Amino acid sequence: MKKIYFIAGEMSGDFIGGHIIQNLKSNEGLEFTGIGGQYMEEAGNFKSLFTITAINFIGFIEIIPHLLKIKKLIDKTVENIINSKVDLLITIDSPGFTYRVAKRVRKFLPNLKIIHIVAPSVWAYKAGRAVDYAKIYDCLFALLPFEPPYFTKVGLDCRYIGHPILEQEFYRDKIALRKEFKIDDNESILCVTFGTRKGEILRHLPIFITAIQKISKDYKNLRIIFPLVHPDHEAIIKPFLENVQFNYLFLSSERLKAYAVSDLALAKSGTNTLEISASGTPMVVAYKVNIISFFIIMFLIKIKYVSLINIMAGSAIIPEFIQFNCRANLISNKLKELLSNSQKRDNQVVESQKILQKLRFASDRSPSYIAAKIIKQEFL
């Protein structure tokens, strides 16, 4: 029985890990263990060492109060990997945690095969990480087509597999969905996402709600949909909705339907923007972090945009309102502009689809299938 140890530190990584486990399950002689969430637990006989929310932090300053806790979890994870006598370690994204674990494990188990999935964004900042990863990992799976050369040139085996998020079944029949959700013909639907972490949600909530309040005065038939990453998030959001003048509903298990049925979205920057674009829905992206974290990022970063669609296009296909521009009046003005102009909304969808086509798959097989095949044939 071969044992694979997975580590995923956030929902997107859990999603990727779950799909890869699904594709590996056809091999009966495999056992899966490690750290993951709902997707990985549902995909196989997988029990997480601890909940992924324990290591799901973002930002340079925001993470400081949790450093001691994270160090203890790194120690616990490394000890668990060593004691589990695993045949392969696979880390997924969350480099702040996964790289530190892999580096420690490499010292204790120099012959263990270690794979990382989701290449660090060395093309955006801290290019030296490519060399660091080459010292630790045996193979890197990249989700973006332009990433492998950054790593192969320093001696790390890097394979482009495509973006697993795009493996999902996206809904494109808006008419059928409007009937399912009992949406009147004269209603406009705005989908709003705040983020996956509590800190992100609380940071964006007052800004986004104020922006919605502003546009709802001009759009009386506007209905807001809040797709929930986790059911607990409803309790975080609800206090901000006590005196609002717009109609809204929460959806906890039909995120992709919420994206697809909407006429427009206001989205916190992240993986969800890919899902919204793949659903054929135009959007406005906004994002804000701790002010000190922001200046550190600005010092390090080499790119102009935060949305992957815009980064790959090299232009602002999707309007972005970042940090000091993440203000309710600016956001509401852009939302009004798009709500009142179907041609601009359609243009964004068309241009986004061109970029998404480049991200879909490295072959006619899904990214998870490709990853699983490489793992089975070359690392087990």
Curated annotation (Swiss-Prot):
Enzyme class: transferase
Organism superkingdom: Bacteria
Record has Glycosyltransferase as a keyword: yes
GO MF annotations in UniProt: lipid-A-disaccharide synthase activity; phospholipid binding
Reaction(s) this enzyme catalyzes, per UniProt: a lipid X + a UDP-2-N,3-O-bis[(3R)-3-hydroxyacyl]-alpha-D-glucosamine = a lipid A disaccharide + UDP + H(+)
Disulfide bonds: none
EC number: 2.4.1.182
GO BP annotations listed: lipid A biosynthetic process
Pathway(s): Bacterial outer membrane biogenesis; LPS lipid A biosynthesis
Pfam families tied to this protein: LpxB
InterPro entries recorded: Glyco_trans_19 (IPR003835)
Record key words, sorted: Glycosyltransferase, Lipid A biosynthesis, Lipid biosynthesis, Lipid metabolism, Transferase
SUPFAM superfamilies from the UniProt entry: UDP-Glycosyltransferase/glycogen phosphorylase (SSF53756)
Cellular-component GO terms for this entry: membrane
UniProt record similarity statement: Belongs to the LpxB family.
PANTHER family to which the protein is assigned, alphabetical: LIPID-A-DISACCHARIDE SYNTHASE, LIPID-A-DISACCHARIDE SYNTHASE, MITOCHONDRIAL-RELATED
Function: Condensation of UDP-2,3-diacylglucosamine and 2,3-diacylglucosamine-1-phosphate to form lipid A disaccharide, a precursor of lipid A, a phosphorylated glycolipid that anchors the lipopolysaccharide to the outer membrane of the cell.
Protein name as it appears in the record: Lipid-A-disaccharide synthase
Gene coding for it: lpxB
